[in-house]
Curated annotation (Swiss-Prot):
It holds the Pfam family Pro_racemase. Belongs to the proline racemase family. In vitro, catalyzes the dehydration of trans-3-hydroxy-L-proline (t3LHyp) to Delta(1)-pyrroline-2-carboxylate (Pyr2C), albeit with very low efficiency. The physiological substrate may be different. Displays neither trans-4-hydroxy-L-proline (t4LHyp) epimerase nor proline racemase activity. The keyword Transferase does not apply. It catalyses: trans-3-hydroxy-L-proline = 1-pyrroline-2-carboxylate + H2O. It is an enzyme of class 4 (lyase). SUPFAM superfamilies: Diaminopimelate epimerase-like (SSF54506). InterPro entries: Pro_racemase_fam. Keywords: Lyase. This is Protein Spea_1705. The keyword Cytoplasm does not apply. It comes from Shewanella pealeana (strain ATCC 700345 / ANG-SQ1). GO terms for molecular function: 4-hydroxyproline epimerase activity; trans-L-3-hydroxyproline dehydratase activity.
Length: 346
């Protein structure tokens, strides 16, 4: 039988994008390493604004089907914009751009070290990253088996509002707290409201999570103390004491952006959660807790120090989790492709 040879290089005919894909505790991250033009702007927020206004077609191309999916997440590496940083990053998802992403930081550090983009010897290395939420200090190190692990100290995180309630259309009265951990989240006790945080209840979690987000957005004004661009509610996080790992403190299910479900416990989400717990006197400084996810992934988070940020009293969270590279991809834009902007199905 005659064999067929497929020419692998199409880049001379089509515009291409190269990515390295990874996941942290089950949540995907698509690291874009080539294909974008120069990202203009002197600050990371200016760069995000430039991408939003001029290059959003590329986000849709790489996040949406048929190249991505409704729950895809991306990281676009930029040059550093502060003297301390090694590089900058913009985070992408199905709806737009986030201010910070904990699982993304952990996966990005793993990718940068495992591909030797950052040299990691035998000693732990500090890596500083410009994000829209602020400067992130990550640490890469080798464990006792020589495997690369990562953790990061997040931006100032705080309890923004406690013991609030809102009437949610089609569901009823919901009690919630609001915390900031690089993004704002509404936290809802799923057990109190009779909502299962299991994988078999994803449809209800998405539906109610979106309803809660919209209800809170309509009734509660968020004002970030420094950056207006960060003054928005990113998602709803359901918390539950019903865990599968006996060492876990609780379970998180985060519904964010346009109904995305985080497979991980959510790095910024566990950061804001530990700030809420500290504000309520339910956790002490430097006391790590494990939070598990809807797919039984887990992150370890602690309040490493108290902090004060422009009048907001909070903590500096430290977060760790496991990340793994899953593939390297070269995506093309056929100029005749009728779905260059992609699409989303649920």
């Amino acid at each position: 039988m005659q064999s067929i040879t497929i020419t692998p290089d199409l880049s001379s005919n089509f515009k291409d994008f190269v990515t390295i894909d990874a996941h942290t505790e089950g949540e995907p991250l698509r690291v874009i390493i080539s294909g974008y033009p120069e990202i203009k702007g002197s600050t990371i927020l200016e760069k995000r604004q430039y991408v939003q206004q001029n290059l959003d077609t590329y986000r849709k191309l790489l996040m949406h089907e048929p190249r991505g999916h409704a729950d895809m997440y991306g990281a676009l590496i930029t040059e550093a914009v502060t003297e301390e940083a090694d590089f900058g990053v913009l985070f992408l998802h199905n709806e737009g751009y986030s201010s910070m992403c904990g699982h993304g930081i952990l996966a990005l550090v793993k990718v940068m070290c495992q591909t030797d983009s950052i040299d990691l010897g035998l000693e732990p290395r500090t890596i500083k990253i410009d994000s829209p939420a602020g400067l992130i200090t990550a640490k890469a190190y080798r464990d006792s088996q020589g495997k690369i692990q990562a953790s990061f100290k997040n931006v100032d995180s705080w309890a923004d509002a406690l013991n609030c309630s809102v009437n949610v259309e089609g569901f009823g009265e919901v009690n919630y707290d609001i915390g900031f951990g690089g993004a704002y989240y509404a936290y809802v006790d799923a057990d109190e409201h009779g909502i299962s945080c299991g994988q078999d209840n994803v449809a209800q979690l998405i539906d109610v999570g979106r309803r809660i987000k919209h209800a809170v957005m309509a009734s509660h004004t968020l004002v970030h103390p420094l950056e207006e661009d960060l003054s928005f509610l990113y998602g709803t996080i359901f918390t539950s004491k019903k865990v599968t790992n006996p060492e876990a403190h609780s379970r998180h299910v985060c519904i964010f952006a346009d109904g995305e479900v985080d497979r991980s416990p959510t790095g910024t989400g566990v950061s804001a959660r530990v700030a809420l717990l500290y504000a309520k006197g339910e956790v002490a400084l430097n006391t790590p807790i494990m939070i598990e996810s809807i797919v039984d992934g887990r992150m370890i988070v602690s309040a490493s120090a108290e902090s004060e940020f422009h009048g907001k009293q909070g903590v500096i969270p430290e977060v760790s989790g496991r990340s793994f590279i899953t593939g390297k991809h070269q995506f093309f834009i056929d100029p005749d492709d009728v779905f260059q902007n992609g699409f989303m199905l649920r």
